[in-house]
């Protein structure tokens, strides 16, 4: 599986550098998600901009990541540009479950705003 991870203070970006997110890649991807979560990554941006095809195993990996970050931080799906990937997400109605943001830059802004909001809330509770 080809991918890159860009780690920052408030978020990490995992960019999948494969055409297909399928049953051959999904198990390794799930393992990487678990590793990043256990490493303490609070917000994960998952970039699918290179991906042209996702099967049910790929969707399962994405949903696994969403569950891992549900009560911990943010899991954001970005770069969902290919029509077949968009269609699969639409048919599966995952846009109502997942946080999907068009670009990496917008995803970073989203994480930044959420981080500021959390800091403000914790300041008012003290």
Predicted stretch roles:
Residues 15-16, 23:
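Thr-Gly-centered strand-to-loop micro-motif
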Residues 6, 99-101:
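General small-molecule cofactor/ligand-binding pocket signal
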Residues 18, 81, 104:
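Short, flexible active-site-adjacent loop segments at beta-strand->alpha-helix junctions, enriched
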Residues 102-125:
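A charged, well-structured terminal subsegment
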Residues 21-98:
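Amphipathic alpha-helical interaction surfaces in cytosolic regulatory modules
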Residues 1-15:
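Short beta-strand/loop segment at the start of cytosolic alpha/beta domains
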């Amino acid at each position: 599986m080809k991918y890159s991870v860009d780690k920052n203070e408030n978020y990490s970006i995992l960019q999948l550098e494969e055409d297909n997110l399928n049953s051959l890649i999904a198990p390794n991807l799930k393992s990487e998600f678990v590793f990043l979560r256990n490493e303490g990554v609070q917000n994960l941006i998952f970039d699918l901009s290179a991906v042209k095809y996702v099967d049910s195993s790929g969707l399962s990996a994405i949903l696994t990541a969403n569950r891992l970050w549900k009560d911990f931080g943010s899991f954001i799906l970005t770069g969902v540009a290919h029509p077949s990937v968009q269609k699969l997400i639409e048919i599966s109605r995952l846009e109502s479950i997942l946080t999907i943001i068009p670009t990496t830059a917008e995803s970073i802004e989203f994480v930044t705003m959420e981080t500021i909001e959390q800091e403000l809330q914790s300041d008012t509770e003290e």
